[in-house]
Amino acid sequence: MISKYLVRDVMKKGVVEVTLDTKLSDVIKTMAKYDISSVVVSDGETFWGIITDTDVLKHYNDLDKTAEEIMTTNPITVSPEAPLEKAVEIMAEKGIHHLYVKSPCEDKIVGVLSSKDIIKLFSDLIE
């Protein structure tokens, strides 16, 4: 059903970024403002990690913590050229809802693939 698709065909291009020193309170405001469930932690040049809604729930009672203190480092990433089937397998095996799409040329996140995006594709293909 999805064998002809690559990650780049379904991913959302671009990501919302915060810096290492961003306070959790500001991360929460950013996530609410853009209605998203995760952000990338970057210094503009280097990708350091991600903060998901689960990370926020774990640390909600300490709003002064920084992104660096609560981020998930070394999250699983995938190439935009990867087969979508492989990305789905990774997400199912690891129990994750987001896969960040990393440029094959540089240490930069170029998009995100979420379980919502995949479910939407499944729905479109069923119709």
Swiss-Prot record:
Keywords: CBS domain, Repeat
Keyword Acetylation carried by entry: no
Transmembrane segments: none
Cross-referenced Pfam families: CBS (PF00571)
InterPro entries for this protein: CBS_dom (IPR000644), CBS_dom_sf (IPR046342), Diverse_CBS-Domain (IPR051257)
Entry keyword annotation includes Oxidoreductase: no
Domain CBS stretches: 11-68, 71-127
Name listed for the protein in its UniProt record: Uncharacterized protein MJ0868
Lineage of source species: Archaea, Methanobacteriati, Methanobacteriota, Methanomada group, Methanococci
